[in-house]
Amino acid sequence: MAQETLETARFQAESTTGGMIRIVPLMFVLLWSSSFITAKVGLRHLSPLLFVAIRLVGCAVVLSVVMLVLRRSWRPLANGRWFHCAVAGALLNAVGLMAPHIALVTTPAAQIALVQSLTPLLTAACGVLLLNERLRAAQWLGLVLGLMGVGLVVGAAALESAARLQGLILAFVGVLGLVAGTLYFGRFCRDVPLLQGATVQFLSAAAVGSLGAALLETPHWEWTDGTIAAVLWNTLMVSLGGMALYSVMLVRGSVARASANFYLVPVTAALLAWGLLGERLSAHVIVGLVMASAGCWLVSAAASPVLGDEVSQ
């Protein structure tokens, strides 16, 4: 009887854990999409690189305190692993945030989110070349479709204004940071405990972000309730919560499968921007969003049977 009760409790625990794991991608999409909206609000009163620097320093401080309180060892970062985590953090959290935040000053959030949808497409393509992952025909179709969707919006932006085009180019630089950081993490950091790895990543990113704010802009700030709320949300919920969820997805699967969860981000961010910021969506942007999201979905839907089997085992 006692053994049956123990087995029942174990089954319930496993079911609960499995259910939590299944909703991780949805939670990530909602958090990541919201960051474009709250960043827009914060950038009304904060210069972009200062916004990013405060966000990254806040994350680094919180995680360092958690490390001290929990008395976690730094030993898992021995043998040069700390360096790999630092590189991944600089790419994912510094380059991946600094460029698109500058872009958000002049470019609608929906269009920035659309360019960010290139992340799973480029990650999947690079995974084939660098990590020996394999893609199915449907996923190659998804890559082409997504690129066409983003190209449609970028082409239209080039005709609208130079500032809009520059913003989208900066957003693409952020994508390159995310892709490089994702691949680097998948290659060198997957066996590092989450807390230790994340702490080093944010310490590195905070250093790069602070240096960028000091050298690349003239910082300005005006603290309002909206600004404070935006900084807190993007620091605690998006950077800490969102990147933790992303790391969980990376550890449990291939880099292509993890980053493919971005396919819902453009549409979700566009709807949030329309509802909360009053951003209007032109016909070509809507078409581009649909094409890019469909492309990312194709990459994601076909990932399970083929992608990551060799990497995750």
Role assignments for model-derived ranges:
Residues 23, 27, 53-58, 83, ...:
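Hydrophobic residues within alpha-helical transmembrane segments
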Residues 6, 63, 126, 135-157, ...:
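Hydrophobic transmembrane alpha-helices of multi-pass small-molecule transport proteins
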Residues 52-54, 93, 97, 110-118, ...:
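Helix-helix packing/entry segments at the starts of transmembrane helices
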Residues 1-27, 61-88, 101, 105-106, ...:
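Membrane-interface interhelical linkers
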Residues 47-59, 102-119, 164-176, 226-236:
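Structural signature of hydrophobic alpha-helical transmembrane segments
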Residues 35, 58-62, 115-129, 144, ...:
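Alpha-helical transmembrane segments of compact multi-pass small-molecule transporters, enriched
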